[in-house]
Amino acid sequence: MMTRDRDPVTPLLLVRRAAVAGERDVAALLSEVPLDAVEVADLMRHHRVVVLSDLTLPSAAPPVAAAAFRIHRPAGTAELAGIGVAVHLRGRGLASRLLTGALMLLRAEGLERVQACAAPGGAGASLLTSIGFTADGGTARADGRARLVLPL
């Protein structure tokens, strides 16, 4: 079935909060960030992890991408802890689609800004700046990564 102005091979995708039952799949997606399974479990239970699901697959299929955020409610901020896309699906814009949806969810929860860190000139920095993140004027990180911020 093809809908108007939609490529028939582009799957229908849904951004949703990650379910604890899918913790192992989320940890696998975020393992290169690197976030270990213990940290992923903490982020899923106490902060926010969102996933991108392919609606053309069975409901038990693992998500195709995941993004984890540390939520700081008193400050009204979230920090992007990491984002991961299934290896065989990279380079198709899924990270951008996931982050765009995640940012809308965070805004709906009342958060006011999202912070992130990325290597200058790297793919992560390129992704973040393409969706509106800008350099944070604060001090540079000791590991050389740039601090970025996006007001919601």
Question: Model-predicted segments: where are they?
Answer:
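Acetyl-CoA-dependent GNAT
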Residues: T3-D5, L13, R17-A81, A86, ...
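Short hydrophobic/aromatic beta-strand or adjacent loop that forms the aromatic wall/cage
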Residues: H47-V49, D143-R147
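A short, internal acetyl-CoA/4′-phosphopantetheine-binding micro-motif in the GNAT/acyltransferase core
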Residues: I83-R90, A118-A119
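Conserved acetyl-CoA-binding loop-helix of GNAT-fold acetyltransferases
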Residues: G91-M104, S130
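Conserved GNAT acetyl-CoA-binding A-motif
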Residues: L106-A119
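Conserved beta-strand-loop-alpha-helix junction that forms the acyl-donor binding cleft
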Residues: A116-A125, R141-D143
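Conserved acetyl-CoA-binding loop of GNAT-fold acetyltransferases
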Residues: T129-G138
